[in-house]
């Protein structure tokens, strides 16, 4: 996967290309997991973030966030704990009340960042994928990003929806 990504940006300066989604289909590409490829995009700075839906599939963030109020919770999520879920649900009910939104109008999102490991070239994408799977199973969309600071996450989310955005920490 890493060699394939490097070949996509060969002879291009950094910042000239951003890839939102990559899917692999075909007889020789069947063994490549699209979800791991998506994480490699973030790791290689070819994408600012990738989004997994409730089924654990990679989706285009702008399409998913369209006309949705977004409530995001940042964390490491090595384990999905009931306390985190309770905190998020309390924040969601408050967010719905303040923004006068129904449950279907609010997208529940968890965000994991690879930025804290930016200096570590050996980022374990399979660990991030396992955490994303656990969070998807718990009923959350999962955004895995390269954002170090909270305001960057907020800017990214606000750039993909015109509706209100809130972050739970």
Predicted stretch roles:
Residues 1-169:
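Nucleotidyltransferase catalytic core that binds NTPs
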